[in-house]
């Protein structure tokens, strides 16, 4: 009993697609937040906050909250 080359190609393609889909498991790291020690005054610009946070060694920063504080973020 001979298997056709088209069937072999189709099965190989199916297995490759399944292996690719099953291999795409994404793990998301937790993010830790800390108030900036160097930022002074109300936080009106998230880009300024991010620059100050980068200088403090964090990966990013954002203005948040009612009091508009600069919060620095990094992976935990």
From Swiss-Prot:
GO cellular component: extracellular region
Signal peptide range in chain numbering: 1-29
Chief location category: secreted
Keyword Signal: yes
Keyword terms, alphabetized: Antimicrobial, Disulfide bond, Fungicide, Plant defense, Secreted, Signal
One Pfam family it belongs to: Gamma-thionin
Top-rank taxon: Eukaryota
Family annotation (InterPro entries): Defensin_plant (IPR008176), Scorpion_toxin-like (IPR003614), Scorpion_toxin-like_sf (IPR036574)
Disulfide feature: 32-76, 43-63, 49-70, 53-72
Subcellular location: Secreted
GO terms of biological process kind: defense response; defense response to fungus; killing of cells of another organism
Task performed by this protein: Confers broad-spectrum resistance to pathogens.
Family of the protein in this entry: Belongs to the DEFL family.
Protein name: Defensin-like protein 5
